[in-house]
A protein has these predicted regions:
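Primarily the dimerization/phosphotransfer
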Residues: 1-30
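Short conserved segment of the HATPase_c
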Residues: 165-179
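Conserved micro-motifs of the catalytic ATP-binding
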Residues: 70-75, 114-117
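Conserved catalytic submotifs in the C-terminal HATPase_c
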Residues: 76-81, 98, 103-113
Length: 234
């Protein structure tokens, strides 16, 4: 199947799958508002809603990745503070980090730094990288998020002390549907969409993303480079 045909098929599938899932989430919320309900039924509804929302996030990520690859994903450009992006992303990822007992260290440059881009999409980029680091790091790990301004670019680094990546596999980590081999990677779940979406969104912002690792057991680092606002302010 040709790539354009595959992209069209994926776009159709995501649309067809999303509609019934939205209905399931809405129905679960509506039923959960009923007062006279057994605790076991309420718990089952909560699980149903949570799993449906998780599936929706996967579908939305897939749709956005396909749209970005085709140049059909629009961005809402505005002036954004780097600190706002980091704060929103760390808050979004906080539940996953806490559930795995990870320690997160954040280091930002002194003074305000501004970018021009889509706030929600840039938060999504950083959240995906933090979530990826959390999933591939054993419980109780240390994840570092650092931001610097270098040569007119904002450089964001997400470093973990997790399972690491075979250097031979690094060129493919951003490929759509690519998953690292081995049982340890399979335990994390996912479909290999998150990093592909990161690459697509970063490139739409005129930036680049790369990954490095010295091999299994050495952790991994993902580096995002984005243009800083020319005057450095809003």
């Amino acid at each position: 199947m040709s790539q354009p045909r595959l992209d069209e098929l994926l776009g159709t599938l995501t649309h067809e799958l999303r509609s019934p899932l939205v209905t399931i989430v809405s129905a679960a919320q509506l039923i959960a508002n009923e007062r006279d309900m057994k605790p076991s039924v309420r718990r089952a509804l909560a699980v149903m809603e949570r799993q449906s929302r998780q599936a929706l996030r996967i579908i939305d990520d897939l749709f956005d990745t396909c749209a970005g690859t085709e140049g059909k994903l629009s961005l809402r450009k505005e002036v954004i503070g780097l600190a706002d992006i980091v704060a929103a992303a760390t808050e979004t990822a906080s539940h996953l980090l806490a559930s795995r007992q990870h320690r997160l260290t954040v280091s930002l440059p002194p003074g305000p730094v501004f970018l021009e881009g889509d706030l929600l999409r840039l938060v999504q980029v950083l959240t995906n990288l933090l979530s990826n680091a959390a999933k591939f790091t054993d419980p109780g790990g240390h994840i570092r998020l650092t931001a610097r301004v270098e040569a007119g670019q904002v450089v964001l680094r997400v470093r973990d002390d997790g399972r690491g990546i075979d250097p031979d596999l690094l060129p493919r980590v951003f490929d759509l549907f690519h998953q690292l081999p081995g049982p340890a990677a399979q335990k994390t779940g996912g479909l290999g969409i998150g990093l592909a979406l990161v690459k697509s969104l970063v490139e739409l912002h005129g930036g680049s993303v790369s990954a490095r690792s010295d091999g299994p057991g050495t952790g991994a680092e993902f580096v995002v480079r984005l243009p800083v606002r020319a005057d450095g302010s809003c």
